[in-house]
Structures are given as C-alpha cells and as structure tokens.
C-alpha cells in the first residue's frame, strides 16, 4: 500500500516528505520512520499547508501505532493517546491536523480489536490522503467557473500541490481553469516572512507552465489600482462557522485591498477545514513563530540585534470581506452562518 505525490511519499514503512524549507534552491527529502519524526517535520515546516499537515499526521499516527502496539486493545488505545497528543501539539491553527487525528482515533475505536489493526489504520491514512486529492480536484472544478478567459489572479502564500497531498486548493482552481483551456495569469505575492509565495507558488506554477509573475507583498494594492488583478484566490487553515477565515499572515491585508478595489476575494478550502465548533475568527488560536523568521532572510541577519519582533503565522479575514468560499461540495456565498452548515446537512 503506497502513495507518491510531489509533497509526500508513503512507502509502507516510512513517510518521505519534500523539504519545503529548501525549495526552490534544492529538492531534498526528509524520511520519517517514527511518529516523533513526523511531528518534528510538521513543527519545523518541512511540510506545511493545512491538508498536507493533516495527511502527514495521519501517517504519523500509523507509525506511532506500530511503535506502541500491544496485544491488549484498551492498553493500545491508551498508548495511542500519547501519539495523538504529540502530533496535535505541533501547530495550533490548522484544523485539518486535529480533524485527521480525530478521524484516525475514531476509526481505531470503532474497529475495536488488535487483530489486523495496523493494516486497518494504514488503510485509513491512505484514504485520508487519496480523498484529499479527489476533494482538491472537485474544488478546482467548481472554482474554475468563477474565472474568465484572460483573467489574472492574485495568490497569497502557497495553497497548491505542496500545501495538500496533491493538486492544491487555490492553485487547484487555477490549474482546473487552465486545463479547461482558459488563459489564466497569476500574480504571486512573496508572502513574508517565510516567502511561501516566492519560493513555493512560483516554483509550482513554473513547473506546470502556468504564467506567473512574482511581486513583493507591498505591491498588491498598487497592482489592483492599475487594473492588473481580476480576482484573488487564497487557501485557508481554518474557517469558522460564521465564515471568518484564518490563513497565512497578510491574507487580511489583501482582502481589505480587494474590497477597496471591487475585486472578488475567494477562499478555496475543503470541508475538513471548516470548523463549525469555532464560532468566529476570535476563537481561532493564532500560532506565533520564532523571531528569527523576521530578523533573518536566507540565513542572513537583516535587522538590528535584540530588536523586538511580533511574528504571528496567521491572521483572520472577516467574513464580510469574502466573496465566496469554494469547497468540494460547491461554492458557498453569504450568509455563511447558514450556508456553511448546509454543507454538513447533505
């Protein structure tokens, strides 16, 4: 039972992740043979993007099950709580992490016996990964309807194949539109401080032969004013029940600018990223990362010694700034409080 994509490879014995910290200068890989190695890869952003984190955690759970296996089922379940906790404590904002781990834990409890349990859990993790690819392609098909031939789309961060198991959410929409024969151009903003737009989105799109122009973060408003942008499409790390969206820091700024210039602002996200238990964006925990991500660039210090740093990894975009949320079940328009719930009633 194997899986191989641009982002990850499951060999049956280990999880191999492309090291996204090294792209585009190098294509290196990290081999994870234990659940703690998977946890480290998530925490250190070897792998990033909510769906990719969720799938990686599921495979981490499988590796943990092999390490913790005992013949007594209840004792095994108890040991797996520790595995889940270690994986869950890596990054707090992306809800797919907790969704995937809860799904694995619930599947284990429902299975209810130790005979064949390791193979069962491996199959469940593979299902999570394969479903993610199918979901992303469905998001792409729905979202492509919103783009016209000749449109230029602004993206923020990386919500492509690298952020998922494959194909991508925001970039999946662009890929699908291009596959339909539409001539789509992309403006990718660099996305400081981790430069996911410059390093990852530009790299991905160039590999696919999609027309991409890189801009710095402070150019997006001017590009909009000049009429160079027809739509904005971003991904999401968590969507609250009222439609507020947590995504990579800088998303809120882009949404405000899009609103000012009358440009549609779309969020592409699977239903696994929608958290109906989170009422509003105020309830979403925002991860803060180390100060060196801001004070250093490419290993070179660019700020004074001992300067104070504020480095939230995410921000929250208010629902009223979002034109629509594109999911694998269709396009959701306001009022989000009502229409997001309908996705889970069908």
Curated annotation (Swiss-Prot):
UniProt GO BP: L-methionine salvage from methylthioadenosine
Coiled coil: none
Pfam family, one: IF-2B
Chain residues that bind substrate: 48-50, 91, 196, 247-248
Catalytic activity, as annotated: 5-(methylsulfanyl)-alpha-D-ribose 1-phosphate = 5-(methylsulfanyl)-D-ribulose 1-phosphate
Keyword Cell division appears in the UniProt entry: no
GO molecular function, one term: S-methyl-5-thioribose-1-phosphate isomerase activity
Site (Transition state stabilizer): 157
EC number: 5.3.1.23
Keywords noted in UniProt: Amino-acid biosynthesis, Isomerase, Methionine biosynthesis
Record: active site: 237 (proton donor)
EC category: isomerase
Keyword Isomerase attributed: yes
Pathway participation: Amino-acid biosynthesis; L-methionine biosynthesis via salvage pathway; L-methionine from S-methyl-5-thio-alpha-D-ribose 1-phosphate: step 1/6
Superkingdom of origin organism: Bacteria
Alphabetical list of NCBIfam families matching this protein: eIF-2B_rel (TIGR00524), PRK05720.1 (NF004326), salvage_mtnA (TIGR00512)
Role summary: Catalyzes the interconversion of methylthioribose-1-phosphate (MTR-1-P) into methylthioribulose-1-phosphate (MTRu-1-P).
Family membership noted in the UniProt record: Belongs to the eIF-2B alpha/beta/delta subunits family. MtnA subfamily.
Protein name: Methylthioribose-1-phosphate isomerase
Organism of provenance: Thermosipho melanesiensis (strain DSM 12029 / CIP 104789 / BI429)
Lineage, broadest ranks: Bacteria, Thermotogati, Thermotogota, Thermotogae, Thermotogales
């Amino acid at each position: 039972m194997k899986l191989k994509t641009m982002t990850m490879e499951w060999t049956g014995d280990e999880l191999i992740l492309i090291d996204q910290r090294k792209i585009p200068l190098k294509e290196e890989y990290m081999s994870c043979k234990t659940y703690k190695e998977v946890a480290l890869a998530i925490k250190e952003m070897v792998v990033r993007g909510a769906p990719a984190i969720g799938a990686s955690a599921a495979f981490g759970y499988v590796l943990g099950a092999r390490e913790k296996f005992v013949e007594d089922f209840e004792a095994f379940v108890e040991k797996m709580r520790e595995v889940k906790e270690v994986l869950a404590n890596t990054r707090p904002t992306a809800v797919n992490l907790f969704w995937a781990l809860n799904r694995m834990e619930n599947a284990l409890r429902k299975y209810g016996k130790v005979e064949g349990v390791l193979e069962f859990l491996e199959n469940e993790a593979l299902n999570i990964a394969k479903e993610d690819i199918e979901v992303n392609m469905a998001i792409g098909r729905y979202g492509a309807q919103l783009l016209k031939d000749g449109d230029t789309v602004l993206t923020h961060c990386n919500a492509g194949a690298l952020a998922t198991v494959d194909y991508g959410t925001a970039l999946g929409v662009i890929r699908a539109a291009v596959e339909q024969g539409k001539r789509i151009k992309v403006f990718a903003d660099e996305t400081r401080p981790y430069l996911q737009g410059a390093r990852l989105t530009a790299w991905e799109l160039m590999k696919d032969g999609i027309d991409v122009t890189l801009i710095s973060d402070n150019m997006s408003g001017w590009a909009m004013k000049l009429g160079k942008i027809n739509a904005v499409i971003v991904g999401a790390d968590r969507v609250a029940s009222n439609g507020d969206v947590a995504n990579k820091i800088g998303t809120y700024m882009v949404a405000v600018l899009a609103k000012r210039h009358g440009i549609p602002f779309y969020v592409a996200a699977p239903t696994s990223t929608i958290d109906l238990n989170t009422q509003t964006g105020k309830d979403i925990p925002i991860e803060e990362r180390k100060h060196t991500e801001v004070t250093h660039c490419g290993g070179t210090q660019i700020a004074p010694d001992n300067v104070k740093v504020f480095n939230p990894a995410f921000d929250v975009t208010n629902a009223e700034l979002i034109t629509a949320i594109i999911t694998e079940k269709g396009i959701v328009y306001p009022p989000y409080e009502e229409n997001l719930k309908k996705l889970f009633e069908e």
